[in-house]
Amino acid sequence: MDPCECSKTGNCTCGGSCTCKNCSCTSCKKSCCSCCPSGCSKCASGCVCKGKTCDTSCCQ
């Protein structure tokens, strides 16, 4: 099983090498979510994404 596979309904906690393109997890690390900008220090440690957008607690 691909450790970087992102399911649509579950959680994923991929490591720094994760290159998921279409992560739809409800809880996901920054490395799995393209919605989190690489230059954000708060996102660097991981943020919660909803589909392709970050929640209100990310990068505020």
Swiss-Prot record:
A divalent metal cation 2 binds at residues 6, 12, 14, 25. Residues 29-60 are annotated as: Alpha. A divalent metal cation 1 binds at residues 4, 6, 20, 23. Keywords: Metal-binding, Metal-thiolate cluster. A divalent metal cation 4 binds at residues 32-33, 43, 47. A divalent metal cation 3 binds at residues 14, 18, 23, 28. GO terms for molecular function: metal ion binding. A divalent metal cation 7 binds at residues 49, 54, 58-59. Residues 1-28 are annotated as: Beta. A divalent metal cation 6 binds at residues 36, 40, 43, 59. A divalent metal cation 5 binds at residues 33, 35-36, 49. Belongs to the metallothionein superfamily. Type 1 family. Metallothioneins have a high content of cysteine residues that bind various heavy metals. Class I metallothioneins contain 2 metal-binding domains: four divalent ions are chelated within cluster A of the alpha domain and are coordinated via cysteinyl thiolate bridges to 11 cysteine ligands. Cluster B, the corresponding region within the beta domain, can ligate three divalent ions to 9 cysteines. This is Metallothionein. It comes from Gobiomorphus cotidianus.
